[in-house]
Regions:
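Flexible "cap/lid" loop of the alpha/beta hydrolase fold
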Residues: 109-110, 114-144, 186-190
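Short beta-strand/loop motif that positions the catalytic acidic residue
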Residues: 202, 208-210
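Conserved alpha/beta-hydrolase
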Residues: 40-62
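Conserved acidic catalytic loop of the alpha/beta-hydrolase fold
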Residues: 72-88
């Protein structure tokens, strides 16, 4: 197994009976959680971890990034859970949400799961087709980002994909290091439908969250994910795909924190 970067923020005050493990989405790494979410949940008493999947952030495997599969990322999550060795709530964003779903469906264990702007259980084929109609230029630019990294596209592309117009232009430069190239293979993996793996485990507590202005997923797709898990989705208005770094990130974090209190 490759060596994986894990960022950990220790709890402040009395610690909680379970910890949190955050899994990033495509084109990103663990550092995206450390802007707001890791320190915030640490103040609430949670040990908060974030892992960079292989080829991302400071994890090993960057040279082989184009060939990493969804199965590789699921194996990374399983290895991280085993390494941490503590009761965990898994919180996955976008591709990370799909990694969490596949991990649980293939025998992985967790206290609960939160899916944020997650790839639906049935894959990304319909959202990809929708993006081709809504914003074909963005799809082309994301292809360049996937292959060559942020240096080949301007920061405005990352903003269109991940952030709302409410993020000041002066803030964009500090977010640019949070993004990187992505595996072409895993994007193909997420387009496919596996009827034997998509059905979720109904006994696991799951919270499903989405954003009204998501460039990748329309609210109906987030709601379909929630129905698959026998729950309802919360869609945050005036919010883009990068929910953890949006101006109203605290609304998302507080919604998760309130739900964690019910476990």
């Amino acid at each position: 197994m490759p060596r994986l970067e894990i960022i950990t923020r220790a709890p402040q005050g009395q610690s909680r009976p379970f910890s949190l493990l955050f899994v990033h989405g495509s084109f990103s790494h663990a550092g995206i959680w450390d802007v707001n979410f890791l320190p915030y949940f640490a103040t609430l008493g949670y040990t908060a971890h974030a892992v960079s999947l292989r080829g991302h952030g400071q994890s090993e495997g960057r040279s082989l990034l184009p060939w990493h599969s969804l199965g590789d990322y699921v194996a990374d999550l399983a290895d991280t859970v085993d390494q941490l060795g503590q009761p965990l709530v898994l919180i996955g964003h976008s591709m990370g949400g799909m990694v969490v779903q596949r991990y649980l469906r293939t025998g992985g264990t967790a206290r609960a799961a939160v899916l944020m702007a997650s790839v639906p259980p049935y894959g990304m084929w319909d959202s990809t087709v929708g993006m081709l109609f809504r914003d074909p230029l963005l799809v082309h630019q994301l292809g360049l980002l996937m292959t060559f990294g942020p240096g080949i596209v301007n920061i405005a592309t990352i903003r269109r994909a991940m952030l709302s117009d409410r993020v000041p232009a002066s803030e964009l430069a500090r977010y640019e290091p949070l993004f990187q190239s992505e595996s072409q293979r895993v994007v193909i993996d997420m387009l496919t439908f596996d009827p034997f793996l998509w059905r979720p485990e109904p006994s696991l507590p799951v919270r499903v969250l989405g954003a009204s202005d998501d460039a990748f997923l329309i609210p109906a797709q987030i709601e379909a994910t929630a129905r698959a898990f026998g729950t309802t989705a919360t869609i945050f208005p005036d919010m883009a795909h990068g929910m953890m770094i949006e101006p109203d990130w605290r609304l998302v974090a507080d919604t998760i924190a309130d739900w964690l209190e019910t476990l």
